């Protein structure tokens, strides 16, 4: 199994990064040393809007920022196959009067403000999160960027 070859376990904590411009979602997993290492990069099937943050409910803009996903935000019965809620708006978004809700990473490859994956890919990503929660992780971070930052 890929995890074992990379020195990672199924139940190890995860961390997620999203890059809009590149249409990529990365999953990072913790190793025994407590540090996170890149596990896999997944192509995002679809996201809506443009580069830049979500501002108002209905703008069909996928959010950018730092979000925390807890076990209760996982939806195995989503109308979009499987989904997890990003937790938008976060404290920063609310302080800037940004509105909206139910912004997700989900399957079905359709987006009106979410990050949509293929069903096969959301199954893998959702499974990694589910196993991390089963292993004791209480929440995981999702950092959504407009593009990769470089010098």
Which residues make up each language-model segment?
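Exported/periplasmic cell-wall-interacting domains
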Residues: 58-151
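N-terminal post-signal-peptidase region of extra-cytosolic proteins
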Residues: 1-15, 27-29, 46-57, 64-71, ...
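A short catalytic or substrate-binding loop motif that flags glycine-/basic-rich loops and adjacent residues
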Residues: 8, 17-21, 76
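Acidic helix-start/capping segments at beta-turn-to-alpha-helix junctions
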Residues: 19-21, 43-49, 142-148
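Primarily extracytoplasmic ectodomains and periplasmic/lumenal surface modules that are beta-strand-rich
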Residues: 14, 22-26, 32-36
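Short, basic and Ser/Thr-rich N-terminal targeting/leader segments
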Residues: 12, 19-23, 63, 80
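Short Gly/aromatic-enriched secondary-structure transition segments
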Residues: 31-47
């Amino acid at each position: 199994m890929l995890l074992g070859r990379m020195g990672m376990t199924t139940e190890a904590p995860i961390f997620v990064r999203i890059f809009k411009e590149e249409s990529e979602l990365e999953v990072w997993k913790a190793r025994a040393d407590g540090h996170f290492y890149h596990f896999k990069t997944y192509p995002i099937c679809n996201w809506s809007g443009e580069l830049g943050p979500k501002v108002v409910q209905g703008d069909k803009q996928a959010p950018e920022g730092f979000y925390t996903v807890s076990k209760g935000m996982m939806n195995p019965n989503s109308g979009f196959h499987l989904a997890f809620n990003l937790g938008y708006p976060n404290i920063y978004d609310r302080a800037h009067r940004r509105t909206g809700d139910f912004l997700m990473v989900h399957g079905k490859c359709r987006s009106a403000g979410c990050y949509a994956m293929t069903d096969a890919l959301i199954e893998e990503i959702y499974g990694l999160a589910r196993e991390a929660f089963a292993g004791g992780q209480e929440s995981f971070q999702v950092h959504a960027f407009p593009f990769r930052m470089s010098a």
